[in-house]
Amino acid sequence: MNARDLLATALLLSLLGCATTPVPTSTARDVPRTRVLNATLLERKEGLGQVVVKRDEGLAASACNSRVFANGTPVAEIAPGEKVTFYLPEGEQMLAAMATGICIGGLVEAKASVSRSRPAVFRISYGSSGEFSIQPTAF
């Protein structure tokens, strides 16, 4: 192994060890309309609860978007530092996220308890070992 190969390997390993950082909901940017895949879910309607899904910031997978699903229906593709706000019926709902492009991650899911009284807030993140996840957050 020559010095160039060693440097490339070290760089790759250092990137894999970078965890992403939560973004406060108040500072996360709204996903652009061009990446909204189902605009009807973004409409606030009587009897529905608010769901916010945001994508962490950080070096890990920063070149890729994440596709957000609600009960199997695509909602939007969000980039790091962005959020999508949509509305679902009250009760247990399934959210999912899938890494797009060249990024690893596959499809991950989480149950959301949706209520009209408070938003259900979730984050999409990469851990320090490269694991891709969607989970509830207080940030």
For every predicted segment, state its role:
Residues 1-19:
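Sec-dependent bacterial lipoprotein signal peptides
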